[in-house]
């Protein structure tokens, strides 16, 4: 983007900034520019899904902050298209690193995950289904029960593994598919969307609300290693119980299997985050259960 355009954006919103430069951490959806030391400019790619995501952010972030969630304040949102061909958003800058950049496992960052869980509880309990956020929906994933057979037919494994995975999903389906209360979800809880102070790892904020919407609260416990979930649940339950508390772990496990099988058919993704890699989540599920977790997790595992 020409520097003159960036300077015009800064001038329009009355910001006093120093150097302006493009961040090396640009994501799939947005180009990111650092406006001095205090602000971040997010400019979506010029395509309908990316533009829709930043519009969702513009209403989700104020609602989340009002509920007590730690997330950077929205300083400005401009959809006039007078300076850029797409809407854009300016946020306060969080000075830290993404948790994903630290390359630390859940066992090395338990307090971070507990804090994330607490913020999810505040989000789920504190945002009501009214006002600008009321119509926001998360992108649905297909029912995973057909995926094992599809993957077996494609040659990823054999009919034996398909029967095992199908049986596991059948065990969890009554819990996951029951009518459930709707809660406002972040929708994309990857380690790259968790901001931390690195040494020692200290939670700072959740970022990137473009996938937010209404649904089962348990689905916000996916996109991250399953080994992190017990820490998150501990932090969450210090604030509030989960909706339909007695089936929460079953629904979380269903969601992890759903995403893992959905991703498994992709080709390798060497430049993307952990949650976008085809086999990482399925291997993580196996790793979690090889660690002999206690109940209720042990009751939800279906041995081969």
Spans of model-derived segments:
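ATP-binding pocket architecture of kinase catalytic cores
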Residues: 20-138
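Active-site acidic catalytic loop and adjacent metal/ATP-binding pocket
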Residues: 28-36, 41, 74, 169-221
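Short, surface-exposed alpha-helical segments at coil->helix boundaries
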Residues: 3, 58, 230-233
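Alpha-helix C-terminal capping segments
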Residues: 10-13, 32-36, 64, 176, ...
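Short, surface-exposed acidic
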Residues: 16-20, 159-165, 242-251
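Glycine-rich, phosphate-binding/catalytic loops in enzymes
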Residues: 57-58, 107-108, 202, 221-224, ...
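Helix-rich C-terminal or lid/interface subdomains of diverse kinases
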Residues: 99, 114-115, 178, 213-304
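An alpha-helical support segment within catalytic cores of ATP-dependent transferases
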Residues: 1-16, 82, 106-114, 121-187, ...
């Amino acid at each position: 983007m020409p520097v003159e355009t960036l300077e015009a954006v800064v001038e329009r919103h009355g910001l006093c900034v120093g150097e302006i430069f493009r961040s090396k951490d640009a994501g799939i959806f947005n180009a990111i520019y650092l406006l001095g030391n205090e602000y971040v400019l997010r400019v979506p790619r010029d395509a309908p899904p990316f533009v829709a995501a930043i519009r969702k952010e513009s209403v989700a972030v104020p609602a989340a902050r009002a509920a007590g969630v730690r997330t950077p304040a929205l300083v400005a949102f401009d959809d006039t298209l007078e300076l850029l061909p797409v809407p854009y958003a300016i946020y306060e800058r969080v000075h830290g690193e993404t948790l994903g950049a630290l390359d630390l496992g859940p066992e090395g960052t338990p307090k971070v995950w507990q804090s994330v869980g607490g913020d999810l509880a505040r989000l789920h309990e504190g945002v009501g289904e009214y006002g600008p956020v009321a119509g926001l929906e998360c992108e649905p994933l297909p029912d995973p029960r057909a995926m094992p057979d599809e993957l077996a037919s494609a040659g990823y494994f054999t009919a034996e593994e398909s029967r095992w995975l199908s049986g596991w999903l059948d065990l969890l389906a009554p819990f996951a598919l029951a009518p459930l209360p709707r809660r406002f979800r972040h929708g994309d809880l990857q380690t790259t969307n968790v901001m931390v102070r690195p040494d020692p790892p200290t939670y700072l904020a959740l970022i990137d609300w473009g996938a937010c919407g209404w649904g089962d609260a348990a689905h916000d416990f996916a996109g991250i290693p399953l080994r992190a979930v017990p820490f998150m649940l501990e932090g969450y339950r210090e604030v509030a119980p989960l909706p339909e508390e007695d089936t929460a772990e079953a629904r979380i496990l269903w969601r992890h299997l759903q995403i893992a099988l959905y991703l498994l058919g992709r080709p390798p993704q060497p430049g993307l985050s952990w949650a976008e890699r085809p086999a990482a989540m399925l291997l993580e599920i196996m790793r979690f259960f090889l660690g002999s977790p206690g109940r209720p997790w042990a009751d939800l595992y279906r041995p081969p």
